[in-house]
Amino acid sequence: MDGLLAYMYTMMAECRAQGRVLKRDFLVQCGRSMELFPGVREWFARINAFGERLGVEVEHYVLSSGLKEIIEGSGIAHEFKQIYACEFYYDESGLAAWPKLDVNFTNKTQFVYRINKGILDIARDKELNDSMPDDSKRVPFTNMVYVGD
């Protein structure tokens, strides 16, 4: 089993075993308590201003094997054009029912291509896989800076 799907499944199973509910709101709330390193909040405005001085529009994205709901709760979520991360599917009562998306080491490449081609919607797989001339791509790879951990 994929390790990320396993940890997401285990989160659901452990919550059930402990009589806890795993809902989106709970995970978003976890993100609100996330501590950021000094300077992280200010970094976005600084790099955006630097890009503007050079005539470059800067966009920020997250490609993470963490949980999207937690990242969305963080104090910097609004800085990102798109957040690609693991996320749950929720049933009609709002409970996490199954892993909806996992973003692992290998498929992070897919999300870099989404940014490259400007196809940010994860439901548009066919278009993502269609051939596209380089001069039609929204963000050339040469214009990307990828910072990883």
State the predicted function of each range.
Residues 31-61, 65-149:
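C-terminal cap/substrate-recognition subdomain and adjoining C-terminal extension
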Residues 1-52:
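A metal-dependent, Asp-based hydrolase signature
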